[in-house]
Amino acid sequence: MSVSSVLAVSCGRGRTVDADIIPYVGYILSDTTSVEHSILDGYRQDRFGTIAVMGPAENTERLTAYLMKCDLFDNVDGKVMKDGLPDFAGETFAAYYDTVNVPYQDFFINGNEEALRGLTVRHSVAALDSRCYEGTYSREASVEKSPSKIVIFSSPFSEAGIADADSLFSMSGVGPILISPVKSLVDKVIRKYDEGAMIGIWAESDVLSSGVFASAFRDCSSDGRRAADYVGFSPDMNNRMKDCLIHYLEMFLDSGNEMPLSAILIDDFSYPYDKNALSSAVDHIRNSTDDKIAKYRTLLSDDFEVIGCMDAIAESCYRVLRRKNLFTHRIAYPQAVEYMITGTPGQGGEIKYVELSQKYVHQ
């Protein structure tokens, strides 16, 4: 069934585009001559499709590299246990480096959130296309590429447009699975912790002020799922990890909170996330005899843990591939292809998805 047919059936049953969804979604669904409509019409989810990672170049490069080598699960039974093999063996990642729309936080700062939501939808649809541009100045998309079965966003700010993209794919009846840092972190918390648990969010101040975390927790509550209490801070990152954690806990105390933290969610791609350094920092607080440190000990619950966004994203991706039987089952190291999201001077500011010549394999 074509996208047009699905739209007609949906409207016939009284379903219309949600008033909260941006007009761009309605345009794609209704304009049969649009490029986006054509892409959706020709898309079929395939287990041999790529796993797209899209967003600012630095975040995307770091996240793609991590996903290619991470080993969190036993690939035979899916248990949380290292098995010495890459979790995404046999998979191909498609890294899309956005160089023209960054920094994403400027959309919020300038009060132009709708444009960012539209960009998220546009990127999602582009990942499904079977063609891309050979170069920045190419007039036509003539290079073949593999459509994606999953789209992972590497920026927390993209969360603002996830609902729009989800609505588009739901109404059209086709589309990839969408994964984001914020949703991955919040979903992990909702699965693991009871209502009333205190969760700390560690993120850049622009992320916290954008409201993407507040929206994600609110959506969980509206879905009828239990939601933990949460509070967010942005500690100074120009110190040792131990000092950063203490600074975070000091901010937590200064806000009037005394309830022990069950977990801290780290959603920050601007610095290397070091599990060992954080683990050592937690051990230092738990075991220190220094009276100045002792006051922080009571802020950490017995099962306190730190959850990083890259681990949460990897878990979300792995579980959905396993649940929906979308693994390729190829016996090979993960590999990646790369694309540049760029603009073309003199061509109306058109955004293009350009193939890069590099292709690499994790060894």
What does each model-identified segment do?
Residues 1-6:
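Bacterial N-terminal signal peptides
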Residues 8-363:
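Non-catalytic structural scaffold of enzyme domains
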